[in-house]
């Protein structure tokens, strides 16, 4: 049986890698709270599985690989993508996170390395915004995702 896999150009792959994520794939996390604890500055992010799905979809499961190396409290991800049978490598790192430190550093370093190939770069164009927050019984911050998007639209309309 003949291999029917169509080879895409580097430009086509780069375009597909850098496509914005669907709004439903983007989440918001608090960066810092106001002194009175009623609002928080929130930042847009995607889960590492969303990045892995993009790499699998665009590059194929055999078209990318990553290696993680720890340097003290920092983790460096070396991410390789196969373009026209040649591996192209980019690296970036992250420190331990407040929640599941090692896992967070591994995930964050992969996401940061993927940005070098355009994956998720558009997230840096979204403004950080303040939104009202709620806290659950354990004191965990709860953020309404719709409130975040409304605040982004307001801020972007103020800028233009």
Model-based region annotation:
Residues 160:
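Accessory terminal regions of nucleic-acid processing enzymes
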């Amino acid at each position: 049986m003949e291999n029917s896999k169509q080879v895409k150009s580097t430009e086509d792959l780069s375009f597909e890698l850098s496509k914005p994520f669907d709004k439903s794939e983007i989440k918001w996390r608090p960066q810092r709270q106001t002194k009175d604890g009623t609002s928080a500055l929130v930042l847009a992010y995607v889960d590492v599985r969303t990045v892995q799905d993009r790499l699998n979809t665009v590059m194929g499961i055999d078209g990318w690989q990553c290696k993680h190396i720890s340097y003290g409290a920092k983790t460096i991800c070396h991410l390789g993508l196969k373009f026209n049978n040649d591996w192209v490598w980019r690296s970036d790192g992250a420190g331990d996170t407040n929640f599941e430190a090692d896992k967070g550093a591994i995930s964050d370093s992969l996401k940061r390395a993927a940005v070098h190939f355009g994956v998720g770069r558009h997230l840096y164009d979204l403004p950080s915004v303040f939104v009202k927050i709620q806290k659950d019984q354990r004191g965990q911050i709860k953020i309404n995702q719709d409130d975040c998007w409304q605040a982004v639209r307001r801020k972007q309309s103020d800028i233009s």
